[in-house]
Design a protein with these regions (language model features):
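Canonical P-loop GTPase G-domain recognition
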Residues: 177-180, 186-234
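Conserved glycine(s) of the Walker
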Residues: 50, 54, 221
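Long, well-ordered amphipathic alpha-helical subdomains in the mid-to-C-terminal portions
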Residues: 12-14, 213, 224-291
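Conserved beta-strand segments of the P-loop GTPase G domain that flank and frequently precede/overlap
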Residues: 105-106, 157-160, 182-185, 213-215
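Short glycine-/polar-rich loops that comprise or flank the Walker A/P-loop
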Residues: 67, 99, 151-154, 176-179, ...
Length: 291
C-alpha cells in the first residue's frame, strides 16, 4: 500500500492521485492514515485579493526555516469538463523546486460550494504525511469561502482595500467564518481606513477577530501573520471538535449518495417533466425509493 511521506513527493503524489480519482485501492490508503496534529490553514477571499501571492510569501518564510509545507490549491471546474481550468499557480512557480514544499492543484468537480469531499480526503492524506503546515487556498467563488471553514483549523480571509464598498457583505458573511482578516496590498490608498473599519466590525463579536495588514508581494506583515497562526494553533478551542463533526457529515453525505446515477436522474427527470401532473417532490420520493 502506498504511504504518504513528506520526504517522498513521488509516492505522495501517487497516493493523492489514487484518492482524487477514487482509483482501486484508495479506500485502503484512507483507512490506513495515521493521525497527526498538522494545522490546516484555509486561505480564502475574493478573486484578486492576492491569495496566491500571500501563500507564496508564507512558503518563502517557512521553507527558509526548514519547515515542510504542503499546499492544496483549489481550482474551479467547468460543469461540462472535469479538468482543472487554472492549473498550478504561476505565482508559486519558484516553489516547485524546493525539497520541503509540496504543491498540488485540485479541481472542485462541480461541488456547489467550491470544495468537495476529495478536498477533505486529500488534506487528510497530507496531514498523515507529517508536514509542518498545510495550506488550502480557494478561488473564493460561490460558497467556498464559507465551506472552507468546515475544513481548516484556521481560516484566513484575505481582502483588499478596494473591498470597502462591500463591507456590509463582509459583516453578514465572512465575519462568521474568519479566524483572522488579512488586509493584503496594505500599501494602497484607503488600506488603513479599511482595516480600521474591519476592526470595528470584528469587535462587535464576543471574540474580536484579529485584522492583520500585509503587503505579500514585499513580504511585509508576514511574520506577524505567522505569529498569529502559531498562537491560534496552540490556543484551546472547541472548533476542532466542530470540524471533525462537519467532516464526518460531509463524508457520510458523499458515501450515501455515491451509488446514485446522475445521468440516469437527468434522463428520468427529462421524461417526467413532460407530464402535466409532474411534481418534483413526488418524483424525488419515487426515484430515491427505487435507486
Amino acid at each position: 500500500m502506498l504511504k504518504a511521506s513528506k520526504t517522498d513527493f513521488k509516492e505522495l503524489s501517487r497516493a493523492l492521485s489514487l484518492v482524487e480519482n477514487s482509483v482501486a485501492g484508495y479506500r485502503e490508503i484512507l483507512l490506513g492514515l495515521k493521525p497527526h496534529a498538522t494545522p490546516i490553514i484555509g486561505i480564502t477571499g475574493p478573486p484578486g485579493a492576492g491569495k496566491s501571492t500571500l501563500v507564496n510569501a508564507l512558503l518563502n518564510h517557512w521553507s527558509a526555516q526548514g519547515k515542510y509545507v504542503a499546499v492544496l490549491a483549489i481550482d474551479p471546474t467547468s460543469p461540462f469538463n472535469l479538468g482543472s481550468l487554472l492549473g498550478d499557480r504561476i505565482r508559486m512557480a519558484e516553489q516547485f523546486n524546493k525539497p520541503n514544499v509540496f504543491i498540488r492543484s485540485l479541481a472542485t468537480r462541480g461541488s456547489l460550494g467550491g470544495l468537495s469531499v476529495k478536498t477533505i480526503e486529500m488534506a487528510d492524506v497530507l496531514r498523515s504525511a507529517s508536514f509542518d503546515y498545510i495550506l488550502v487556498e480557494t478561488v473564493g467563488v460561490g460558497q467556498s469561502e464559507v465551506e472552507i471553514a468546515g475544513l481548516a483549523d484556521i481560516t484566513l480571509v484575505v481582502l483588499v482595500p478596494e473591498a470597502g464598498d462591500e463591507i456590509q457583505g463582509i459583516k453578514s458573511g465572512l465575519m462568521e467564518i474568519a479566524d483572522a482578516f488579512v488586509v493584503n496590498k496594505a500599501d494602497r490608498e484607503g488600506a488603513d481606513t479599511f482595516a480600521n473599519t474591519l476592526k470595528k466590525l470584528s469587535q462587535q463579536k464576543a471574540t474580536p477577530i484579529p485584522v492583520i495588514s500585509t503587503v505579500a508581494s514585499k513580504a511585509k506583515g508576514i511574520e506577524e501573520l505567522i505569529a498569529f497562526i502559531d498562537y491560534f494553533e496552540k490556543s484551546p478551542s472547541i472548533k476542532k471538535q466542530q470540524l471533525i463533526a462537519q467532516k464526518a457529515w460531509q463524508l457520510l453525505q458523499q458515501k450515501l449518495t455515491a451509488g446514485l446515477n446522475k445521468e440516469q436522474l437527468q434522463q428520468d427527470l427529462a421524461e417526467a417533466v413532460q407530464k402535466s401532473d409532474f411534481n418534483l417532490y413526488q418524483f424525488i420520493d419515487n426515484w430515491t425509493s427505487r435507486s
